[in-house]
């Protein structure tokens, strides 16, 4: 039995979900831990309550609903498009508030019209929040990971650096640190004598020699390749580490990256600003901007008020599975996030779906909504 009570508005919230043409689903509280550890991001991973089955399987208390709902969709072989709604407890170590709390939300799976589906879920979130908080001014912050990825690719960064920057998207301190590293790369020697020695021997440019050298060293020091990474895996990681550290981004490209990340303006003005930025920087990011433009147009077509919406180029959310739109909603003048979500087009494939399933959704923090409703009275 839950240790906390459902908010009094839970029934009305579920009725709102039904009006939005969703199918309510539930998922087990005890979940396999691996999907969350692999795909949920560092911020969520360190907050998960872990346990273990009698057979040694790593399990956890459900820390969120998106991954369980997607797994359920795959397991039941349900066709798409499909819109799921959920409401239930999640368990997460938090700095403020209880570690057991209620979340609700919608996962919109399988609609090939990306812009329309993105606009629909933002509209869904605003609809249910407006009904719970009729006297409050809601503010929406939007970002777009696909535009960010297009910009860093157009700047000519190596694939390894692109992965690091994408992983840091939404964490301004981490992005600043990585950009500082790109402005001042390290020499191979900073990684220690072993790396300096193989660099001096020219092995970093000859993978087979490097693999053989690592294998001989492992054998001589008693390391088992069965109990650790293979010599080839270690060689590839070593070369990537040195290559990343030695990469320098020229001043012009760094200025372009920083100019992009500084964009922060009303959503209605964002398409023109992004096209102007891309033109001045001579970046070929047409596909990403075309989708961005289509989403803004779809929001207008759906009747969404652009006034409360703001685009921040550096805005992301601390979950690794997002691929495009990301957004959060809060009451004007307060920091508490009431709703957050985005697009996660790769997630279902990574979880085992046999075909590509585009997906977008959002979650609501019911305890925070209840607190906001209490302030309103």
Swiss-Prot record:
Superkingdom: Bacteria
Location within or outside the cell: Cytoplasm
One Pfam family matching this protein: tRNA-synt_His
One Gene Ontology MF term: histidine-tRNA ligase activity
Signal peptide: none
Keywords of the record: Amino-acid biosynthesis, Cytoplasm, Histidine biosynthesis
Pathway: Amino-acid biosynthesis; L-histidine biosynthesis; L-histidine from 5-phospho-alpha-D-ribose 1-diphosphate: step 1/9
GO cellular component: cytoplasm
InterPro entries, sorted: aa-tRNA-synth_II/BPL/LPL, HisRS-like_core, HisRS/HisZ, HisZ
Coiled-coil ranges (or none): none
Example GO BP: histidyl-tRNA aminoacylation
UniProt cross-references to SUPFAM superfamilies, sorted A to Z: Class II aaRS and biotin synthetases
Primary role: Required for the first step of histidine biosynthesis. May allow the feedback regulation of ATP phosphoribosyltransferase activity by histidine.
Subunit text: Heteromultimer composed of HisG and HisZ subunits.
Note: This function is generally fulfilled by the C-terminal part of HisG, which is missing in some bacteria such as this one.
Family membership noted in the UniProt record: Belongs to the class-II aminoacyl-tRNA synthetase family. HisZ subfamily.
Designated name of the protein: ATP phosphoribosyltransferase regulatory subunit
Organism listed in the record: Sinorhizobium medicae (strain WSM419) (Ensifer medicae)
